[in-house]
Each structure stands twice: as structure tokens, then as C-alpha cells.
Amino acid sequence: MELNELTIIQIREKLKNKEIDAPTLVDSIIKNIEEDNKRDDKIYAYLEIFKEEALEQAKKAQERINNGEDLPLLGVPLAIKDNLCYKDHLMTASSKMLEGYKAPYTAPTVQRLIDNGAIIIGRTNMDEFAMGGTTETSNYGVTRNPKNRAHVPGGSSGGSAAAVAANFAFGALGSDTGGSIRQPASFCGIVGVKPTYGRVPRLGCIAMASSLDQVGPLTKDVKDAALMTKIIAGFDPKESTTLNIPVPDYVAALDGNIKGMKIGLAKEYYDTDLIAADVKENVMDAIGKLKDQGAEIVDISLPNAKYGSRVYTAVMDVEVASNMGRYDGIRYGYHPKGDFNLDEYYYTSRSVGLAFETRARILFGTLMTGKRFFYSHYQHALKVRKLMQMDFDNAFKNVDVIVSPTSPVTAGLLGTRDQTDSALSFLADSYVSNINLVGLPAMSVPCGVDKNNMPIGIQFITKQFNEVDMFRMAYAHELANK
């Protein structure tokens, strides 16, 4: 196995034991990225590599290692999504609107990685302002799936997922508003975690939909995911949505023992012909192995799950319209040149600075808050959101973990996102976006491949702030399928 194929914990052990030095490690990864970028079908996981800075940080990390310092991420190269603040570094959310913008401070999640010794190697590509599921709406080019370059990596954290899957980073940060960590993790065959809403600070992450957004890690295995989640989690006094409650040691909880734990299977996620046969078969086989390890299978129902995609669209677009209001070319954003009145200036800034997908969501969200639709659609969506929360609360009275496919299908071909069947799209959204609507923790873990050798993901969901059981079940699955 090549060094860049190792996990965070494995490479830390080699750094600690002086089997490899940090500058050599960072230089090797950067050279691999640069070599790949010469290809016509380059993966294009990164918008920017912090080459000189990363190499300098690696030298300092090695000095600290030589002096006996021991931190969980010391000398480990990690990546961050292009919507996370890293002081004095470019941050564009893959949009022309923020072209040339530099972050004025470092996000707490990024700072916590740095405080634990990580080397931030670069910023990764994404769908513009995190609006998309394929990483094809980026203003700076598409990212390809490392497992098959003709396919999408998923989105919106497709660059982060591709970087980890291609061994261009040992781990990465992404953001998840409606599956934007878990779905690309599934498509690229890696692990992706969306922690409980309020477990990890959102400060320093460009807001898409403030009641849904959550920052989380993408890694090569469950143990690394547990480690990174532990590091970035916790109260931040500047972040109003984080709760001041203890963060468990998730790595220590990975004992592989799930005997007596109850797994819930929601009929709404399985009783449909829209799930690809390979996906359903692999997920059910994995559940069977968990049962063999002593877990109990319980049939449950989430009756309002079928409305999830529509509820998500209404809530998300309204919040998008609100959050995107600041990008007017005056406070933030693209500054058009010419003689304009105020309305013309706003129009030109947004028309040039924002891509179609983003403009469409702003328009739909604005429409939803108008008199005609506010009560009949938006307010109704909020009520159904509450019913969905009650469904999950009731389910968790009887089970410890809910298990589902992360996506009913595997990664599609590049350039085909507008050809997806609407019913399938609604179902795919419901697997992941429902979890954001109710603020639960969930993670995607690899679960075999389909007939075309494309990765399949299995999703583990637990009640709020019970990431321990989520990681424990995911780890048991991982051990059973090695």
C-alpha cells in the first residue's frame, strides 16, 4: 500500500515513528495532484493548492514531531471546502460572485484542525454556493469521480470527496445542507459524516440554508471520521447554534460490539421500485451481517418521509433567498463596471456573478415568501417538517439506529443531471435531506459496488447528539465488510 493510501491514524503513526517525514509526505501528495492536473480528464478536486505554505507548515510540523510533540493530526495533510473561511486565503464558494474574495478570519472548524497539527493543503471545488448535487455548477470547472472519471463525484462537497477518494488528502471538511457530504461520500466510496445540528460550529461556513447547514468530515474509514468529528465538535461562544454539552470520545467507542442494538428499517426507504437492484441488495446484505453480529432488526414507519423532498425544497429555497440577499455587488460580490442606476447595478451583478442554479433557487425562495404562497406552501412545509421530526422521535423510542441506502442509485454520468427522473430525484433527496430537516446525525459508509463497479453507500442515522451509536454501528459494518 502506498503512503498516500493510508488513513489519518495510520499515517500519524508513521510520522510519529519517523518512518516518514512530513515535508516528504506533503511534497508527494502535491506532486500527485500536479501530475493528475496535466491530464485532459483530470479529477480537478482542488481549486487551489497552498503549495508553498503547506510545505513550510510541513517543515514546522516535522520540527514539532522531532521535539516529541504528539497531536492527533500533527503533520497530516487535509483539505477544506471552498465555502470555509481560512484567514487571508481565497474563498469563492466556486462562484464568480466571490471571485478574489479573501476570508477575514478562520472558521472554528478549520482552526480546530490546525490546532491539532493538521496541514491545510488546499481548498476544494464545489457546486456554486453549495447549490447542486454533482459539482457541475461550479464556476471554475467540473470535478470528476476518481472511481470512474466519466461519472460525477456527487455534490455539493464533490471536490472534498474526490480529494479523499483520489488520495490527494487524508481527510477533508465539507458542508451538508441536504446530503452534500453523505451523497458524494457514497458516490466516491468513502466515509462522510453530518453531525447533529448544533454539535459543530457553522461559523465561518458560507450560509446556504441556516437551519439546515452543518460542517462535517470526509475520510477513508470510520475511525478517521470519528477522530475528525471529535476534533471539530464542541461549543463555540461566537456560534449561537452550538450547544455547550460534552463531546464524547468517538474513537474510544469503536469497540465493534453491537449485540442487542436495535436497527430500524423504514418501509418508506425500501418498498419502492425506484431503488437500483444492486443498491438494495448490497444494503440488505450488509444489514444481514449486522444481524449476525447480534443486532436486532425492527420494522418501522416514517409516514411523512415521502414529503421530505418537497418540504426541503420549500424551506431551503426560502433560506437561500434570504442568505443570498447580501450578494448585491455593494456589500459583497461582483462589481460590474459601467453606468447603472441602482436596480440595473443589482441586476447586472447578480446576472453575471451567479449561475442559473443559484438564481433559480433565489427566485423560487422569493416567490415562496410572497403573499400568494407563504401560507399555502411555506408555512405548510414548516408544519410537515415538525411532523417529520415527530416521526423520527417515535421511531427512536423503539430503535437505536435507522439504516438506509445513502442514495437509491450510484453516481451518474457527467452532463446528465438534467435528465434525472423527477420521482427518483425526490426519493434520492428524501434519504438525505430529511435528516437535515430534523437535525439528526447521519453518516455514509461504503457498502460494495454496483455492476458497473461504482460505489454504493449505506447510511446510519441516530437521534440527536447520539453520534456514539452511529459510529459504533458504522464501525461494526466496516469490520464485517473488510
UniProtKB/Swiss-Prot annotation:
SUPFAM superfamilies from the UniProt entry: Amidase signature (AS) enzymes (SSF75304)
This protein's record includes keyword Nucleotide-binding: yes
Active site positions, chain numbering: K81 (charge relay system), S156 (charge relay system), S180 (acyl-ester intermediate)
Listed InterPro entries: Amidase, Amidase_CS, Amidase_dom, AS_sf, GatA
Bridged cysteine pairs (disulfide): none
EC number(s) per entry: 6.3.5.7
Keyword rRNA-binding assigned: no
Catalyzed chemical reaction(s): L-glutamyl-tRNA(Gln) + L-glutamine + ATP + H2O = L-glutaminyl-tRNA(Gln) + L-glutamate + ADP + phosphate + H(+)
Enzymatic class: ligase
One GO location term (cellular component): glutamyl-tRNA(Gln) amidotransferase complex
One MF term in the entry's GO annotations: glutaminyl-tRNA synthase (glutamine-hydrolyzing) activity
Gene3D superfamilies with a match to the protein in the record: Amidase signature (AS) domain
Protein's GO biological process: translation
Keywords for the protein's UniProt record, in alphabetical order: ATP-binding, Ligase, Nucleotide-binding, Protein biosynthesis
Transmembrane region(s): none
PANTHER family to which the protein is assigned, alphabetical: GLUTAMYL-TRNA(GLN) AMIDOTRANSFERASE SUBUNIT A, TRANSAMIDASE
Family: Belongs to the amidase family. GatA subfamily.
Subunit structure as annotated in this protein's UniProt entry: Heterotrimer of A, B and C subunits.
NCBIfam families (UniProt xref): gatA
Protein name, per record: Glutamyl-tRNA(Gln) amidotransferase subunit A
Organism of origin: Brachyspira hyodysenteriae (strain ATCC 49526 / WA1)
Gene: gatA
